[in-house]
Amino acid sequence: ILGYIAFAFRKVSHPFRYGICAIIAMLHDVLVVVGIFAILGKHFGVEIDALFVTALLTVIGFSVHDTIVVFDRIRENQLRRYGESFEQIVNISLLQTLVRSVNTSMTVIFTLLALYFFGGTTIKHFVLALLIGIVSGTYSSIFNASLLLVSWENKDFLRIFRRAEPEAA
């Protein structure tokens, strides 16, 4: 994934940053699904099986694809809007891809909800893993990956992890 994204984004500065940010967003999505299923397994006896692994692989593909769509628009706008700040370019790119990302995700979510409520019991956990992963993937491709990219571009990467000081009243 890192190699493909670095090759695809070779015309922008620091193409490996795009790949690393996409991988971090993808790991976020996988960890969200695994974490929720760990809680479900502990409290409700939900077991991990081959369908769960299939759902994780599908979530990975969806997450990376959605992130690449956002990053591709950032790349296009960098070439078109030369001279604007990187934050402005990312903001414009997010606004341009937001409707597409939400519409794609909602289409998948409605289909998965129909499968969850009207499908067989054997695929309920598979569909639930997909639902959690698609929601997490949509969120992370829009917000997490872009924030990481902007923070890294501004060399302010560690600011994300710092806690804000409380203001005096």
PLM feature segments, named:
Residues 53-73, 99, 104-110, 139-145:
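Transmembrane alpha-helix detector for multi-pass membrane proteins
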Residues 15-72:
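Hydrophobic transmembrane alpha-helices and their membrane-interface caps
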Residues 22-28, 81-119, 128, 134, ...:
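Pore- and gate-forming transmembrane helices of large, multi-pass membrane proteins
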Residues 3-4, 8, 32, 36, ...:
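Alpha-helical membrane-inserting segments
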Residues 8-12, 40-45, 118-120, 153:
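Short helix-capping/hinge motifs at transmembrane helix termini and TM-loop junctions
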Residues 91, 99, 118-169:
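Hydrophobic alpha-helical transmembrane segments of membrane transport and translocation systems
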Residues 19, 34, 66-73, 77, ...:
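Membrane-spanning helices that line or support transport/gating and their immediate boundary helices
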Residues 1-32, 57, 105-117:
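Internal alpha-helical transmembrane segments of multipass membrane proteins
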